[in-house]
């Protein structure tokens, strides 16, 4: 559909084959301009003008002035404790850190390792359900939304949520209140790095869906995202990942959309691990399961290979990778009242070291 995209990915009319070298000289030049001129090399000048021109040609609504006025925000991370681990993770407008804090602090009240698999999975799913409910209701861009972050990440609040979980019965999602309490991949990439001096990086970047918007601005090599789908375009209507959205994540000029990115670093007295993943709304639960794996004594390879399960409040069902759950576990979970959907495809792509 888009000339610039065809020139990069369909140079001879066909997509590149495995083993073929994909050369992107326009993107290389754009990166050189950024290296030389910093932010001005991207948001302003010839690259910014080319981005705006290609978007305008296709009927897009943002202006060159809006792109030039974009600024990066640096925010304090979410930090909390879990069973001897100090966890550092992403703050809003990523929802990942708040949801991760809630889930781990709920689960920290139980000895999961001592439980049979169905009982352990049940509790993990119920923690996911409650965290994603709060994600939907409260979280958004902190420049626009007054969020009760101190409450949502408070161990006492997690204890209150834990008390609402029945040990052997699922909580129907539609019975969890959808009203706020009073205030107090698939085209995502993650890399986790530790160097010889102990410097650590956990970084996630995304264009949202496969190939983002599909538009490469001619002459730049830049593939533009379709992150607008991460906004709640209509309260109560799910996005492409099935995630519900409320007013806190509604579209507003200059607002950053809520994401699920969860780059995290965890440290104990003698260990450190870095985690993150692609996967849309499943990112948060992938990182959760990874941290639970490290806490259970697994190494990085074992953690990365863990089968994945996921629950996001709505739709009210457990998603599972093929063979992630034993048949007897599925049977018991269904007896507890859980809907279980075992898919045909894997989605786990946790990057950890």
Where are the language model's segments positioned?
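Noncatalytic scaffold domains of N-terminal-nucleophile
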Residues: 1-38, 42-44, 49-91, 95, ...
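Internal maturation/activation junctions in enzymes
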Residues: 13, 110-207, 216-220, 235-236, ...
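Alpha-helical support elements that line or immediately flank enzyme active sites
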Residues: 37-44, 49, 54-55, 105-106, ...
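Short, well-structured alpha-helical segments that form the helix of a local strand-helix-strand
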Residues: 50-52, 116-129, 300-310
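Active-site rim segments in enzyme catalytic domains, especially the processed small/beta chain
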Residues: 61-63, 199-268, 289, 296, ...
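Glycine-rich phosphate/pyrophosphate-binding beta-alpha loops
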Residues: 88-97, 192, 204-215, 277-284
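Extended C-terminal subregions enriched in glycine
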Residues: 255, 287, 295-345
């Amino acid at each position: 559909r888009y000339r610039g995209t065809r020139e990069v990915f369909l140079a001879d009319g066909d997509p590149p084959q495995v083993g073929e070298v994909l050369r992107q000289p326009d993107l290389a030049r754009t990166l050189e301009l950024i290296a030389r001129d910093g932010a001005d090399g991207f948001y302003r000048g010839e690259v910014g003008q080319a981005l705006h021109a290609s978007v305008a040609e296709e009927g897009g609504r943002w202006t060159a002035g809006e792109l030039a006025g974009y600024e990066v925000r640096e925010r304090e991370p979410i930090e909390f404790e879990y069973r001897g681990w100090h966890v550092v993770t992403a703050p809003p407008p990523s929802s990942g850190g708040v949801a991760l804090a809630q889930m781990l602090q709920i689960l920290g009240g139980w000895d999961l390792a001592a439980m049979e698999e169905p009982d352990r999975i049940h509790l993990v799913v119920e923690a996911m359900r409650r965290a994603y409910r709060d994600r939907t209701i409260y979280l958004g861009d902190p420049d626009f939304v007054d969020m009760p972050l101190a409450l949502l990440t408070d161990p006492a609040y997690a204890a209150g949520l834990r008390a609402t979980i029945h040990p052997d019965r699922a909580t129907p999602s539609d019975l969890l209140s959808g009203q706020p309490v009073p205030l107090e991949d698939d085209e995502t990439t993650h890399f986790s790095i530790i160097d010889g001096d102990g410097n650590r990086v956990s970084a996630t970047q995304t264009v949202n869906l496969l190939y983002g918007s599909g538009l490469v601005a001619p002459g730049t090599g830049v593939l533009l995202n379709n992150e607008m789908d991460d906004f709640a375009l209509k309260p109560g209507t799910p996005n492409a990942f099935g995630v519900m959205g409320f007013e806190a994540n509604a579209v507003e000029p200059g607002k950053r959309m809520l994401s699920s990115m969860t780059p995290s670093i965890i440290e104990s007295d003698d260990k450190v691990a870095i985690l993150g993943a692609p996967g849309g709304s499943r990112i948060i639960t992938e990182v959760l399961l990874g941290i639970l794996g490290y806490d259970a004594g697994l190494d990085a390879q074992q953690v990365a290979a863990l089968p994945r399960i996921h629950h996001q409040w709505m739709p009210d069902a457990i998603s599972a990778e093929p063979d992630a759950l034993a048949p007897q576990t599925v049977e018991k979970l269904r007896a507890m009242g859980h809907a279980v959907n075992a898919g045909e495809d894997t989605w786990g792509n946790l990057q950890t070291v």
